[in-house]
Each structure stands twice: as structure tokens, then as C-alpha cells.
Amino acid sequence: MATPEDVRRIALGLPETTEGPDFGFVVDGKAFVWLWRERIEPKSARVPNPDVLAVRIAHESEKETLIEMDPAVFFTEPHYDGYPAILVRLAAIDPALLGKVLTDAWRLRAPRRLNAAFSPDEA
């Protein structure tokens, strides 16, 4: 089980990452992980859900693979159809897997110079 503290520690351990509003993490001005904004009531505003992360992935097709791998951890909703992000249940994900998922997401958004200089052992 991962915690918000694990997310913050892992994300801020990645080079040039900053924390933005609503527990979102950014590199080079690009978000790679943020809190899922859930719609509690139909036609109402979405509100951040502290138990679920939205994490950037390479391609939308990756969603199906992740969901099949572990549907207790990974899921999606219609709001994310056509968008390269997967939803992650914090209570269900192992911190080591969370580290891999966040590092992969960071690599997708980080500029080439950071990717080239980054060693996973640094995180």
C-alpha cells in the first residue's frame, strides 16, 4: 500500500520536479502525475480524490495492458478516453511499482537533457 507521502517522496526525488496545486507534480512545466478529480454528483464540479492518482502513460493503448495486469490497482473512466493517462488506486499499489510508474511518467514529460542524465538509482 502506497501513501501520499510515498508519492511526494518519489516524485520530488526525480530531477527538476516541482509540486503544483492539488497534489500534482510537474517537470519542465508538464504534469506527469496528479490527483484524480472525481465527479461525486452528476452535473457537479469534479473534486480531487486523495486516494486515486492520474498518471501519464505513453499511449492510450497502454491502459488496457495495465488494467489487465492488475485491475485492483489500475483503472480508467470515460473522462480519460482518448487521453494517455491511467488511474491508480494508492491503497492497492506497492510502493516499488508506484516508483516505476511515476518514473516512467516522468521520463515521458522530462526534456531530453534530463532523461539523458538521469539514472533510476537516483530516485
Regions found by a protein language model. Give the residues of each.
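Charge-dense, helix-prone N-terminal extensions
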Residues: 1-123
